[in-house]
Amino acid sequence: MSYLGVGLSPVNVAGTKMKLMDRKVRLTELILRCSVCALALVAAILIATDTQVKEIFTIQKKAKYTDMKALVFLVVVNGIAAAYSLLHMVRCVVGMMKGSVLFSKPLAWAIFSGDQAIAYLTVAGVAAAAQSAAFAKLGEPELQWMKICTIYGKFCNQVGEGIATALLASIGMVLISSISAFALFRLYGGNKAQQGSRW
């Protein structure tokens, strides 16, 4: 209670804590979306610009990312993830500037579904590229597949860097999808509390 005889009600304190928590969650989401956008873009550029030319028995062979379909898929997925994150960065910034909170269930479902889809795509892209990279690095003696990375060392190293960067972007998307799940399902939890207070 203050000296003026006016106290703080528990509802006001809880509301202030919720606003502070909501601000922190939105800031975390914005930072994660910026990180995912940058990491996905770097991963796509690292892999898409990677080439190496080797001469094998007087024949020049150029290794490029389009030679492995898993790398093409990874570049496309990272491009999509970067564009998607950029769009949602704008949404986050506008929401923070307006001070608005997401109360629309259909919009929350759309954001949650989009985040889930992009998270699954990035995880699938990293998994496929990692499997192809393992074959390139280790070969497959039973199928008489040779170790490509012994020939194209620079190419394999840059692809490895791209896959590692894509893995970080993928982890970021999984975290973002967790935040969007929190934002969605808290809309359902608050209604029960409000309905219970009416009785």
From Swiss-Prot:
Pfam families: CASP_dom. It is a multi-pass membrane protein. The chain crosses the membrane at residues 27-47, 70-90, 107-127, 165-185. Residues 48-69, 128-164 are extracellular. InterPro entries: CASP/CASPL, CASP_dom. Its main location: membrane. It comes from the Eukaryota. Residues 1-26, 91-106, 186-199 are cytoplasmic. The keyword tRNA processing does not apply. Keywords: Cell membrane, Membrane, Transmembrane, Transmembrane helix. It is found in: Cell membrane. GO terms for cellular component: plasma membrane. Homodimer and heterodimers. Belongs to the Casparian strip membrane proteins (CASP) family. This is CASP-like protein 2B1. It comes from Eutrema halophilum. The lineage of its organism: Eukaryota, Viridiplantae, Streptophyta, Embryophyta, Tracheophyta.
